[in-house]
C-alpha cells in the first residue's frame, strides 16, 4: 500500500511538469535548438579581452546599448549605493555595496 502511494505521488508530481514543458518544445523546436547552440562568448572578442572579462571580480556591468539617449560612447560605471538601513553589526561596518549605471563621459 505504501509503495502504491509513493508511485502515485510521483506520478502526480511529474506528470504536470511534463505536460507543462512538453508543448513548448513541440510548438517551437527551432527556438530550443537556437538556445542550445547560442555562443556564450562574442566571436569578435580577442583572447586578451576574454581573459580580462573573466578575471573581473564581482558583478558584471550592464549592457548600456541604447540607454544613454544618443550620446556616444555610453559606458557602464560603478557607484556605491547608499543604504538607509544602519549597519547592525560591526562585521559589516566596512561593507559598501556597489551598483552599475550607464553614463555618458564628459566631452
From Swiss-Prot:
Residues 1-24 form the signal peptide. Keywords: Developmental protein, Disulfide bond, Secreted, Signal. The gene is EPFL3. This is EPIDERMAL PATTERNING FACTOR-like protein 3. It is found in: Secreted. Controls stomatal patterning. GO terms for biological process: guard cell differentiation; stomatal complex development. It comes from Arabidopsis thaliana. One of its GO terms (cellular component) is extracellular region. PANTHER family: EPIDERMAL PATTERNING FACTOR-LIKE PROTEIN 3, EPIDERMAL PATTERNING FACTOR-LIKE PROTEIN 4. Pfam families: EPF. Belongs to the plant cysteine rich small secretory peptide family. Epidermal patterning factor subfamily. Disulfide bonds join 64-102, 68-74, 71-104.
Amino acid at each position: 500500500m505504501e509503495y502504491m502511494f509513493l508511485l502515485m505521488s510521483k506520478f502526480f508530481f511529474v506528470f504536470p511538469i511534463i505536460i507543462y514543458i512538453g508543448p513548448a518544445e513541440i510548438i517551437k523546436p527551432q527556438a530550443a535548438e537556437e538556445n542550445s547552440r547560442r555562443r556564450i562568448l562574442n566571436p569578435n572578442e580577442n583572447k586578451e579581452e576574454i581573459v580580462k572579462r573573466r578575471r573581473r571580480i564581482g558583478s558584471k556591468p550592464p549592457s548600456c546599448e541604447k540607454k544613454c539617449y544618443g550620446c556616444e560612447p555610453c559606458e557602464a560605471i560603478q557607484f556605491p549605493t547608499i543604504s538607509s538601513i544602519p549597519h547592525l553589526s560591526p562585521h559589516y561596518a566596512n561593507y559598501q555595496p556597489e551598483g552599475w549605471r550607464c553614463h555618458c563621459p564628459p566631452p
